[in-house]
Amino acid sequence: MDLQASVYIADRHGLIGSSLHDKLIQLGCEKVISDPLRESALGDFNRVDGLFSRARPEFVFLIGGASGGIGANQKSPADLMLDNLLVNCHVIENARRHGTQKLLYLASSCIYPKFVEQPMSVESLMSGGLEPTNEPYAVAKLAGLYLCRAYRQQFQVKFIAAIPANVFGPGDDFSLEDSHVIAALIRKMHEAKISRQSEVVIWGSGLPRREFVFAEDMADACIFLMDHYDGAEPVNVGVGADWSIRQLAEMIAEVVGFAGNLVFDPSKPDGMPAKLLDSSVLQKMGWRAKNSLRDGLLKTYQWFANEGMNRDRDASAIL
């Protein structure tokens, strides 16, 4: 990717988008489009068309689309599905119409079948039923992946797709209702430590296994793929190891300094039993994550303790 080229990140303000923006600036990219649309505006075709008409981005990172943990998927399945469908269609079509050289679309590991051989390879996509707790969201993310493939076939465009493991890091959504597992556990344990609670209750059995990639590493992988990949098949982006939710919770408790009991509530849904990606294609290309899970958790908690709580208080004051 030419660092002199114009680059658009949709959505720049999200967890991955903000890390990607910072990384591009560090690399010396001089034309990261400074007129970004917020995630909510990406659902408006005319506004997306207006941005592409003005800025004419040569490279597009399609990161946008609402997401959340099991709670958010249970509470707002239609919102999550519709938002992602609209964002995908609007950005992909405008990238084609306005001559974007290359587009990278980020799907989600939720698009894999609920019961699938581990580690999950792209050949197993569509080979079984999806996890019911996030099926609407997963269908929308699958649609974006296949839309990129269809555009490649019909219009001969360089639209590629990647499937990331669970991404976490500074700037994540730490709300207890809608956040992903790491952000939710960090906040729960931090508040329990401050208020001297004796225990923290965690959804599910603690048995499901998950793979996690730090946001800085995910941003690095996005740029690597933009530079080195142009295939029709999606590429998995993971670290090659997974942890049970119990192991994760114990590690977060240590990082946060919470010394109380961890109580798992098996009456709450677990989601998929395991989600470990087969990232051998990316590894053979020469990419590796730089941050261990523990290092990433330390950086994330330091950010949350210093900035995240203040941001949440500011948001509450506005509401």
Which residues make up each language-model segment?
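Conserved catalytic Lys-bearing alpha helix of Rossmann-like short-chain dehydrogenase/reductases
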Residues: 85-91, 140-148, 182
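NAD(P)H-binding glycine-rich loop region in Rossmannoid oxidoreductase-like domains
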Residues: 45-84, 97
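Conserved Rossmann-fold NAD(P)-dependent oxidoreductase catalytic core, especially the SDR/UDP-sugar
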Residues: 89-134
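C-terminal substrate-binding subdomain of Rossmann-fold SDR/epimerase-dehydratase oxidoreductases
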Residues: 10-11, 15, 19-27, 191-319
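Glycine-rich "substrate-gating" loop/helix at the edge of Rossmann-like oxidoreductase active sites
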Residues: 133-137, 165-180, 204-216, 239-241
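Adenosine-cofactor binding site in Rossmann-like domains, unifying the SAM/SAH pocket
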Residues: 31-50
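Conserved beta-loop-beta element that borders a ligand/cofactor-binding pocket
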Residues: 102, 107-108, 145-173, 183-186, ...
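Conserved catalytic-site region of short-chain dehydrogenase/reductase
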Residues: 69-70, 105-121, 136-142, 154, ...
